[in-house]
Amino acid sequence: AGVPKEEREERLKRYISMVSLNGFENKYPAQLSGGMRQRAGIARTLAMNPKVILMDEPFSAVDHLTKCTLQEELINIRQAENKTVLFVTHDINEAVFLADRVVLLSPRPSTIQKIYEIPLEQKRGRSDPLLLKIAAEIAKDINSGGQDIPNNYWGNL
């Protein structure tokens, strides 16, 4: 009842290539960078061919440049594979850049506070004015206690 060996190998080859890990197939995890380990995890998940992929803070432990690269790769993979991705993050910028919808949860116990639609194509610029507006709205809703957002907060989009 498993996946035949030939199909398994074909899937692995395809997804290793898709996440740019060609040449690293026989390396141990300790021999890979944090970003490469994240890519390997994405390839492993895709090889299982799930309808929905749950990603809980997957890029939180990598540097900013790697994070941006992985975000772009995730968008490309999501489009190529036509997968639904449920992405958990505490990073507003990441949420509005990756999502077609952002769900703001309340503190424990978590309940849905608000849903924000992102009416843009998935291929979008990080500094798109509409993204900045939605991110500011989310930040305002999170900080509804009147706390101001620093002026340079949005500079790293």
Which residues make up each language-model segment?
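Conserved ABC ATPase "signature" region
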Residues: P4-F24, N76
